[in-house]
Amino acid sequence: MALERTFSIIKPDATRRNLTGKIIDRFESAGLRVVASKRIHMTKAQAEGFYAVHKERPFFNDLVSFMISGPVVVQVLEGENAVAKNREIMGATNPANADAGTIRKDFAESIEANSVHGSDAPETAAEEIKYFFKDEEIVG
């Protein structure tokens, strides 16, 4: 077991429905600590940069539009095997395929409006964390 950090976004569909606290409770109840957090309204440029890996995918423009449609909460979560644990808590990308008791099964509206984003690997987490946070903003 390794202590690691992962990156999380609580998406506009969840912030719009005041689910931020309930989602954070899921992370904390599973043993993850929030070591950095801020509520922001992403600019189009921020969203395009963050999701640049998907630039050639057919859903890119819709994803960017959705992510700038309202406030999001960007966070750094820390804990044992944080990346894998967060992905387990979130559930499958498509809420129809997510296990009962996961964030996406319980709160998501659709595959796009699926309430949360989480890093898929420790290397990705490090990149995503640096995209939104300075080192001094992360307090463990």
From Swiss-Prot:
It comes from Parvibaculum lavamentivorans (strain DS-1 / DSM 13023 / NCIMB 13966). The active site is at 117 (pros-phosphohistidine intermediate). PROSITE patterns: NDPK, NDPK_LIKE. HAMAP family: NDP_kinase. This is Nucleoside diphosphate kinase. Signal peptide: none annotated. Belongs to the NDK family. The gene is ndk. InterPro entries: NDK-like_dom, NDK-like_dom_sf, Nucleoside_diP_kinase, Nucleoside_diP_kinase_AS.
